[in-house]
């Protein structure tokens, strides 16, 4: 019996919608990253993007445990000398709610072109509405 290897044009991708209300950031991000990679499928192949599309709504209602709301730091750099900026979880969630989950999931995906393609299948929205109803996403309980 030969080892199965998925071909990119043979992969069937489904759409799922996840409600992030009152979910813990890391636990949600880990499951979303697993589904973006396609590890939940029997046809998973490491060098092929076999994952599904994930739409996450109510991202502004994500939570973290312990003191991480104030202690968790996010860094970015402008590219100029001395141009490093630091913010904490609470401030970033108030200003850009989607970015918190996107950064958490991005760190759990492979680096390189394959990981970037997987990250493009993640759609995050702060409110309860999303523009992907034409794809008829299935509700995914995490």
Curated annotation (Swiss-Prot):
CDD domains: Ribosomal_L13. GO terms for molecular function: mRNA binding; structural constituent of ribosome. GO terms for cellular component: cytosolic large ribosomal subunit. InterPro entries: Ribosomal_uL13, Ribosomal_uL13_bac-type, Ribosomal_uL13_sf. It holds the Pfam family Ribosomal_L13. GO terms for biological process: negative regulation of translation; translation. Keywords: Ribonucleoprotein, Ribosomal protein. This protein is one of the early assembly proteins of the 50S ribosomal subunit, although it is not seen to bind rRNA by itself. It is important during the early stages of 50S assembly. PANTHER family: LARGE RIBOSOMAL SUBUNIT PROTEIN UL13M (PTHR11545:SF2), RIBOSOMAL PROTEIN L13 (PTHR11545). Part of the 50S ribosomal subunit. NCBIfam families: rplM_bact. Belongs to the universal ribosomal protein uL13 family. This is Large ribosomal subunit protein uL13.
């Amino acid at each position: 019996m030969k080892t199965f290897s998925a071909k990119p044009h043979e992969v069937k991708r489904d759409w799922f919608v996840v409600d992030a209300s009152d979910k813990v950031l890391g636990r949600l991000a880990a499951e979303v990253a697993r589904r973006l990679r396609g590890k939940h499928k029997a046809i998973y192949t490491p060098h092929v993007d076999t994952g599904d599309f994930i739409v996450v709504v109510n991202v502004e209602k994500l939570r973290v445990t312990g003191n991480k709301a104030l202690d968790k730091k996010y860094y970015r750099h402008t590219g100029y000398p001395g141009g490093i900026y630091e913010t904490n979880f609470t401030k970033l969630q108030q200003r850009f709610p989607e970015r918190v989950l996107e950064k958490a999931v991005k760190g759990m995906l492979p680096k390189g072109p394959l990981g970037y393609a997987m990250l493009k299948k993640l759609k995050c929205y702060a409110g309860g509405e999303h523009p992907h109803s034409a794809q008829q996403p299935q509700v995914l309980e995490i």
